[in-house]
């Protein structure tokens, strides 16, 4: 269960994986983009997981219709704004929204730097209108290769003060982290935090690469860390967090069933592991489902669930002062409710 005395966070949440089905329908009509269906009920199976996918790449294809309708920078601005509203409606006090500007730009050849600016504008407007603290993480989509990732990184660096971290996502098996060492050096030189998708489709060696070569402070998913006790000890001792996404890992067939998910073992090992959504619109879930349905099915006790909730703020990419201010704000808000 969610502890209402603590800030509720989601620190692994893809902005471009949370584009509403209704918005896909409306933007498709606005930009004359042929969609696989013309009404919401018929469209939903094409843009939302209805059964577990055979692998990560099959799951990621569900995201493609969301970015296919981004026919202008205004469309990018709109979906960013709606992401903040969705975070508020989900009851989140703090969220780190991550996005790949190259992925969002590519269908309609939008300027990548313009996409970054549009997302920032949408987040700024949403943060003004909705009472949720939002930070942005830039993603490099490794699937498109190192050169495309450099273009993406350059666009993100042009707004370096509005981005808190860099991530690497996409085809983990085909594009290992070691190919991106120079990219992450640039990010660290800019003062950004580092999180990396690793140990989702590949083994623990991918997590070691993310830590040793890319400077990862947090690992997205990280499920295969469970087969390397030395890695788990290292993560526990150094405070490298795991951004667990329970339902997502089932839907991508990364983990067979929730009762086999390693999150409970990560927590008991002392790794600062957290509970997150991943791509809520595509998955058809929200953060409350992860706490109230998925976490108990994964074997977490109330104490362990609370620890994961605490970890969500403890390893967030904000200062200790900002964390304390958020804790105090939440207590005031709950007291006046």
From Swiss-Prot:
Disulfide bonds: none
Binding residue positions for Zn(2+): 12, 14, 197, 278
An MF annotation (GO) of this entry: zinc ion binding
GO CC aspect terms: cytosol
Classification via InterPro entries: A_deaminase, A_deaminase_dom, Ado/ade_deaminase, Metal_Hydrolase
Example GO biological process: purine ribonucleoside monophosphate biosynthetic process
Name of one Pfam family that matches: A_deaminase
Domain of life: Bacteria
Family listed: Belongs to the metallo-dependent hydrolases superfamily. Adenosine and AMP deaminases family. Adenosine deaminase subfamily.
Protein name: Adenosine deaminase
The species this protein was found in: Pectobacterium atrosepticum (strain SCRI 1043 / ATCC BAA-672)
């Amino acid at each position: 269960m969610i502890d209402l005395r603590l800030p509720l966070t989601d620190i692994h949440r893809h902005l471009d994986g949370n584009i509403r089905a209704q918005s896909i329908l409306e933007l498709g009509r606005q930009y004359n983009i042929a969609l696989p269906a013309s009404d919401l009920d018929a469209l939903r199976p094409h843009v939302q997981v209805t059964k577990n996918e055979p692998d990560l790449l099959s799951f990621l294809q569900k995201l493609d219709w969301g970015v296919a309708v981004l026919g202008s920078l205004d469309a990018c601005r709109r979906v960013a704004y709606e992401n903040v509203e969705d975070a508020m409606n989900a009851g989140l006090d703090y969220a780190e929204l991550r996005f790949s500007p190259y992925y969002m730009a590519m269908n309609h050849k939008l300027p990548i730097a313009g996409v970054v600016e549009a997302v920032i504008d949408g987040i700024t407007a949403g943060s003004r209108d909705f009472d949720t603290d939002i930070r942005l993480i830039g993603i490099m989509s490794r699937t498109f290769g190192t050169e495309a990732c450099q273009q993406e990184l350059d666009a993100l660096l042009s707004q370096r003060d509005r981005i808190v971290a860099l991530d690497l996502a996409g085809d983990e098996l085909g594009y290992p982290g070691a190919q991106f060492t120079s990219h992450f050096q640039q990010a660290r030189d800019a003062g950004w935090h580092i999180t990396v998708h690793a140990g989702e489709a590949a083994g623990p060696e991918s997590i070691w690469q993310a830590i040793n070569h890319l400077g990862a402070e947090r690992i997205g998913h990280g499920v295969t860390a469970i087969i390397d006790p030395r890695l788990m000890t290292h993560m526990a001792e150094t405070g490298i967090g795991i951004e667990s996404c329970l339902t997502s890992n089932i839907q991508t067939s990364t983990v067979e069933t929730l009762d086999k998910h390693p999150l409970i073992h990560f927590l008991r090992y002392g790794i600062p592991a957290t509970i997150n959504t991943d791509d809520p619109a595509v998955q058809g879930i929200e953060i409350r489902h992860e706490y109230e349905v998925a976490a108990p099915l994964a074997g977490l006790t109330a104490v362990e669930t609370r620890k994961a909730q605490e970890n969500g703020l403890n390893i967030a990419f904000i200062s200790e002062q900002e964390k304390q201010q958020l804790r105090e704000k939440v207590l005031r808000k709950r007291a006046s409710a």
